[in-house]
């Protein structure tokens, strides 16, 4: 809660609309509080650390309450935030829930709602006898950790390069634009697979691959906004005062091009989630045995040819779809609010 309030107060100093400042402040807090340790610190240490991240639960609830107060007039935004906060809350609370071991074989191909060997399988079990409910809830944590982290890294790199190219111009702009145009010449999935084949399959390499495929798009957006903003009076006033170019880019340019970037960030989270899930489905992403939605879809696809086992595919597919829908609806809601403000 203190971190959320601190982020909120910092963002208000940039004269953001109150609703946008509160929302972004909560999102920044959520990026760091509840999710980072599980995969980034390694499976055993990360899972142990996730049990002490109890402050993440009130952080998610605080974000949702702030959104309720600020976005009451936007039904689309509230639906999107509800979906996102639901999965964030699941990701934070899953260590405390009385779930079965997601990797333990119990009874194969048990139908949803069936009790077998004294165990209730709410959403059934897969071909290896593992509980689908447990794997779905634990899997959302991996997807959110890597999706948020990859998008954050891509935005840091892309926005930094875009500000440098747009503000400084000259050979800086030519060099950055050339590299980005080369990367953009590859189809996204082809570039991701190529990088992972060269570097190997690991979580860190996924971050590199997603950054290389996403940062050029962000760079072009930020560069265009910076080219327009650097001609404004407030930038020229900062130049007259003798401010350092880095200070001008971070304090004058970046806050004043925030609107399109916030909307794009929400959409980019959805794109990154699709990319990571697809890579896992193709066997190029996060590796088993830990649960992941893309891996669950891959394992459930053959069994789903028979309708009685289609739940193995439907459950993770609906989970991915609902999370992506939440990001997209939130982006639409922020766009509506920005237009009103």
PLM ranges: what are they?
Residues 14-51, 57, 61, 76, ...:
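Generic hydrophobic transmembrane alpha-helix motif, especially the helices
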Residues 78-82, 90-125, 282-291:
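Hydrophobic alpha-helical transmembrane segments of membrane transport/permease proteins
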Residues 82-93, 148, 152-160, 164, ...:
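Generic alpha-helical transmembrane segments of integral inner-membrane proteins
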Residues 130-145, 149, 169-177, 230-231, ...:
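Amphipathic cytosolic juxtamembrane alpha-helices at the membrane-cytosol interface
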Residues 184, 196-198, 210-211, 224-226, ...:
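Glycine-rich helix-loop "coupling/hinge" segments at transmembrane-helix boundaries
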């Amino acid at each position: 809660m203190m971190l959320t309030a601190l982020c909120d107060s910092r963002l208000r100093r940039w004269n953001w609309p109150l609703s946008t400042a509160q929302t972004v402040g909560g999102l920044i807090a959520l990026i760091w509080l509840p999710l980072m340790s599980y995969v980034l610190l390694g499976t055993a240490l990360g899972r142990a650390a996730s049990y002490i991240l109890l402050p993440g639960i009130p952080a998610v609830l605080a974000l949702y309450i702030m959104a309720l107060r600020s976005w009451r007039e936007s039904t689309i935004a509230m639906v999107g935030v509800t979906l996102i906060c639901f999965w964030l809350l699941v990701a934070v609370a899953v260590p405390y829930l009385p779930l079965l071991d997601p990797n333990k074989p119990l009874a194969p191909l048990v139908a949803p709602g069936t009790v077998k060997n004294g165990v209730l399988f709410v959403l059934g079990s897969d071909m290896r006898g593992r509980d689908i409910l447990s794997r779905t809830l634990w899997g959302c944590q991996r997807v959110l950790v890597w999706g948020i982290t990859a998008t954050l890294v891509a935005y840091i790199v892309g926005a930094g390069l875009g500000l440098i190219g747009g503000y400084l111009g000259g050979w800086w702009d030519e060099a950055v634009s050339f590299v980005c145009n080369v990367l953009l010449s590859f189809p996204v999935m082809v570039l991701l697979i190529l990088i992972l084949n060269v570097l190997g399959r690991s979580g860190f390499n996924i971050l590199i691959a997603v950054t290389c495929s996403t940062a050029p798009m962000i760079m072009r957006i930020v560069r265009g906004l910076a080219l327009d903003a650097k001609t404004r009076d407030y930038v020229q006033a900062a130049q007259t005062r003798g401010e350092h170019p880095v200070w001008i880019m971070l304090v004058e340019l970046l806050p004043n091009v925030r609107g399109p970037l916030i909307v794009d960030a929400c959409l980019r989270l959805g794109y990154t989630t699709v990319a990571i899930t697809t890579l896992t489905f193709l066997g190029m992403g996060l590796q088993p045995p830990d649960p992941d939605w893309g891996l669950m879809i891959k394992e459930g696809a053959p069994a789903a040819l028979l309708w009685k086992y289609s739940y193995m595919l439907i459950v993770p597919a609906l989970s991915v779809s609902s999370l992506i829908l939440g990001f997209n609806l939130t982006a639409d809601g922020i766009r509506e609010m920005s237009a009103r403000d």
